[in-house]
Amino acid sequence: MFIKYLIKPSFFILLVLYSAIGYAQEASTLVAGKAVLWERVDISSRDLFAGPGGTAMKPDLKSIEFIEEEKSGHNKKYRIEDASGRIWVAKLGSEAQPETAAVRLLWGLGYKTEINYLVPSLTIPGKGTFEKVRLEARPAGIKRLDEWKWRDNPFVGTNELQGLKIMMVFLTNWDLLDLQNKVLRVEGQNGPEDHYVISDLGATVGKLGNNNLPVIFRIGRKTGDPDAWTNARFVERVKNGELEFHFKGKGRDIMKGITVEQGRWLFEKLAQLSDAQVADAFRAANYSPADTDLLVAAFKRRVEELNKAVGPAATGKAKN
């Protein structure tokens, strides 16, 4: 009888130890990936209409199966399966178009991003028919890990991270919470890579708030508004070799300490995007021809504004 009672706790302890070892082994595997935020690419040859998924990943809409409703975020989202068996998260509402364009613009510069497409009209069985739906891929071979933090990550102080921060002001992203960031485990050619992406870029192509007061800083914010983005302020001034931006509300502290040299690094990338590529990014997001023209012009003005702030344009071939 004594042995019987002794075996039970011993078995429980062994089970706990085995589970702990298994978890530790899994954790050690997860931290092994090479951290990647940005990579050198041939910017001028990137297809911003197809985007990071290209034509190969385009969703097959011949049939759609509803899986479940996603509870995160402010916009309504549904997890669905397309005719080819691929899984997607369908986002509805005002963030769908700007997010589709923003992903393509960042990817065009070499930043790692989610894979998404804008569908003009989509019927989800049991839920209804919706206009301008963003579909974000959930590939089976990509593992979604934890969020990453703006103030604590492997790229602090680098041109890549500082350039990404500038792009957040450039795109008027007023939702710079760490929970919008995600690490994606991808199998690269030379082993596993951890791609640091901004998973939610919906609060872009509009206007930032107009003050820093608690709660009230939300006043004036806009999303997916071409007219607002055209008139939105960007660079405020250069002071002591650092760029100061028009960025109000939460997260404004992360915009401090960005140098002129880091701004020039980003400008050299932006200058390699053609008008046609930029237009493709907005066309892929289903903006009208008139709005696309407006947005391309606004994009060019912002690039020139950055150029003036960081000094004369780079001569010769821009460095990647």
Which sequence ranges carry the predicted segments?
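Boundary at the C-terminal end of the N-terminal hydrophobic targeting segment
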Residues: G22-A24
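Sec/Tat-exported extracytoplasmic proteins
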Residues: D82-S84, L109-G110, M168-W174, V303-V310, ...
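Conserved ATP-binding subdomain of kinase catalytic cores across diverse folds
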Residues: G53-W150
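N-terminal, Lys/Arg-enriched amphipathic/low-complexity engagement segments
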Residues: E26-F66
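C-terminal catalytic region of ATP-dependent kinase domains
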Residues: G188-N320
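Conserved kinase catalytic-core segment
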Residues: P98-E99, R104, D146-I219
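Bacterial N-terminal signal peptides that target proteins for export
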Residues: F2-S10
